[in-house]
């Protein structure tokens, strides 16, 4: 799928606008109850993501003669509000820092969010962490403020089997650890 220069400009503008916000500790986002982290956890990191959601045209698991765009993985750069690199986000889902620490999440809550043309908002639990760094204390992760990233609207047919679509998206990820 060809990249869309208009979307690239919009995503860049969104990141630039948030980069100018006041610094200091991030405030927890307002989210529906299903996306609240468990009691006893405190927000410690906000990461702004810009990248793609990767889909593959594949047979449906329960109807192999019918095809659909199946989600495969995210691929995104993570930055703070000042635009400094915090790492990358990829399949797992995994968030990895240049300091070698990483966290792998599993979805625990989902909400469609306010924009039907964007991927849903999520609450994830940390399934595992590795390394000793920024992501090591993570217990929960929220994905909110999503823009775009949904599966292509074009039909997925047998003729397009195994075709890959890389759909641009942005999101904010909030990381929680055990409260002190």
Which ranges hold each PLM region?
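Bacterial N-terminal signal peptides that target proteins for export
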Residues: 1-10
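Extended, amphipathic alpha-helical scaffolds
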Residues: 12-15
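C-terminal motif of bacterial Sec signal peptides marking the signal peptidase cleavage site
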Residues: 17-20
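Primary mode marks residue(s) on the alpha4-beta5-alpha5 output face of response regulator receiver
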Residues: 25-54, 61-180
